[in-house]
Amino acid sequence: MEPAFGEVNQLGGVFVNGRPLPNAIRLRIVELAQLGIRPCDISRQLRVSHGCVSKILARYNETGSILPGAIGGSKPRVTTPTVVKHIRTYKQRDPGIFAWEIRDRLLADGVCDKYNVPSVSSISRILRNKIGNLTQQGHYDSYKQHQPAPQPALPYNHIYSYPSPITAAAAKVPTPPGVPAIPGSVAMPRTWPSSHSVTDILGIRSITDQVSDSSPYHSPKVEEWSSLGRNNFPAAAPHAVNGLEKGALEQETKYSQAPNGLPAVGSFVSASSMAPYPTPAQVSPYMTYSAAPSGYVGGHGWQHAGSTPLSPHNCDIPASLAFKGMQAAREGSHSVTASAL
């Protein structure tokens, strides 16, 4: 009996998409095939597609069954606890091993045979879901065990000590005799607040933040600094000047001398009383030196009183100097050389 609903194929037969062919039609296909009828003739006679007939006959020749679906039920489970244990062992020995290498080792070690060995995708799923978390946890535990104890952090700006309630309280605690006292800045390092301002980074804290009720000393506030002047400091003794003895000052004044040519430290010279610098005389670059050689060589090494800046060797330069050509100068030099020889 054909179903009342379905679709019609090219041969005019009715079929339901996604449903297997009824067992009666399957059995009829096998019987006709045993009678020697060709699959194409069976397809036309029963109005079943040629692909369906070929598939049913091929399955019957392989398994001897005409039932649809897998033969023998579902595939037996291959990811047994023993297989998972061996996979974990292989992964721990070689963390960089691949899934196909694990599959080959399972076959080589005899853990599985070719029928129940897990596929590469199954081994990858086992490594990801069952062994991955355990491996990471084991590495984390071993890292925590082998990790050295953290070193005590160096306190920020530990060289300078700052007044704080903790150090003040620590300073009040008496120390037993014979035990050296520990400074407050070393015994209790300063704890900075969780602020990231410039003053906190540079170690400059406001004095108003450091005032504590338990501190025995009075810390001036920022507002009080402006009122502090020279009048608040105790006056010096009459025999002392700025906190120094008069005798020491007189002794230093007695042996202190000002450099030659320079005014004293306490005296000032006005700019108007100083004469301007003398302007140097302009000398032409084309001026020739016409002094006698004997006057230049035999002259003394110091400047004469009657000499001028232009004639330091007491030899006068004529007022009117004529420009001589280069040829005349060369001829004169040649004549002097010849006469000297």
UniProtKB/Swiss-Prot annotation:
Compartment annotation: Nucleus
RED subdomain: annotated span: 82-130
Residue ranges, annotated region (PAI subdomain): 7-63
Stored InterPro entries: Homeodomain-like_sf, PAIRED_DNA-bd_dom, Paired_dom, PAX_fam, WH-like_DNA-bd_sf
Region (Interaction with KDM5B): 168-189
Superkingdom, taxonomy of origin: Eukaryota
Pfam family, one: PAX
The entry's DNA-binding region: 4-130
Main location: nucleus
GO cellular component term, pick one: nucleus
Listed GO MF terms: DNA-binding transcription factor activity, RNA polymerase II-specific; RNA polymerase II cis-regulatory region sequence-specific DNA binding
Keywords noted in UniProt: Developmental protein, DNA-binding, Nucleus, Paired box, Transcription, Transcription regulation
Function: Transcription factor required for normal development of thymus, parathyroid glands, ultimobranchial bodies, teeth, skeletal elements of skull and larynx as well as distal limbs.
Subunit structure, interactors included: Interacts with KDM5B.
Name of the protein in question: Paired box protein Pax-9
UniProt organism field: Callithrix jacchus
Gene: PAX9
